[in-house]
Design a protein with these regions (language model features):
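Solvent-exposed loop/turn segments at secondary-structure junctions
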Residues: 158-161, 169-170, 179-182, 197-201, ...
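Extracytoplasmic
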Residues: 33, 86, 147-149, 156-158, ...
């Protein structure tokens, strides 16, 4: 019934000249004046009268209202289309290997709650605007590889990492990643550098039998990737890096680096730099 009323609204405006109907028509016509163009990657997404007319309803007193639940539903689909956090992306290593990587915390994420408020406000004011949506989180670019051209990359099977700046490799080294067990493997996905600290003590999970941390290790250069304790750091206790060492003497999930390389990387790196870890 409500939907029918919203669809016949424009005809009603022509047929019925009563003050109540005219008031509803004025409100609806104001809504339908709105045109919000979201400037997205490959195409613009436009919210105009074609969409808005389906979101306007009338109550028994002929008050025209915007059904925010329908706007919210549309924004949820909009977010699904343009959010990239956790999605599958493709990367080609400096060595020429192309792999898919999914998961992680890095990428675009539309702030649907904030955008709902903004969109409803624009429609009610009958605004004509071009904009980007509100984002809860942004990435370097809207390209398919949204981390851009400056990033850290870790190839677990190759036990090798690269620091790429503006498309050119600035540093590369063999590494030791997590022991390949469910508890200790290095997580794959697209992340970013969350914290950088000198002379940090890494503390393992509490061992239930002793009540003590499973390890307490001091490192000179700490570059955090996840809040669950994964990061890049120097590992002076490792006699060698690369090869198959990780399969028997792997870390607890961190990316272990030679001291000189960890120091060099720390000196070059910026907070927020994207990190791609893949098999």
């Amino acid at each position: 019934y409500e939907m029918q009323r919203s669809l016949v609204g424009s005809e009603m405006c022509i047929r019925d000249r009563s003050p109540e109907v005219q008031k509803a028509c004025d409100a609806m016509n104001n809504y339908l004046k709105a045109s919000i163009t979201y400037k997205m990657t490959n195409q613009n997404m436009v919210v105009n009268k074609d969409l808005i007319s389906g979101w306007v309803t009338y109550d028994d007193n002929m008050n025209a209202t915007l059904d925010e639940s329908k706007v919210k539903e549309w924004l949820r689909e909009f977010g699904k289309t343009y959010d990239t956090v956790g999605t599958t992306r493709s990367i080609t290593t400096p060595g020429g290997k192309t792999v898919d990587v999914s998961g992680g915390t890095y990428g675009w994420s539309v702030d649907e709650a904030a955008e709902l408020t903004a969109l409803v406000d624009s429609i009610k004011k009958g605004e004509v605007v071009e904009k980007e949506p509100a984002y809860a989180q942004t990435a370097a670019t809207h390209d398919a590889q949204d981390w851009g051209t400056t990033y850290l990359e870790v190839d677990i099977p190759a036990q090798h990492m690269w620091y790429v700046v503006n498309g050119a490799v600035q540093l590369e080294t063999d590494v030791v990643t997590g022991l390949p067990t469910p508890e200790r493997e290095t997580p794959t996905g697209v992340y970013s550098i969350l914290e950088m600290k000198r002379d940090k003590t890494l503390v393992g999970e509490i061992n239930p039998s002793t009540g003590q941390p499973s390890y307490r290790t001091k490192v000179g250069y700490w570059m955090r990737v996840t809040w669950t304790g994964i990061g890049f750091h120097d590992a002076t206790w490792n006699p060698s890096f690369g090869g198959s060492r990780y399969q028997t003497n792997g870390s607890h999930g961190c990316i272990n680096m030679p001291l000189d390389q960890a120091a060099s990387l720390y000196g070059m790196l910026s907070m927020g730099t994207p990190v791609i870890i893949h098999n």
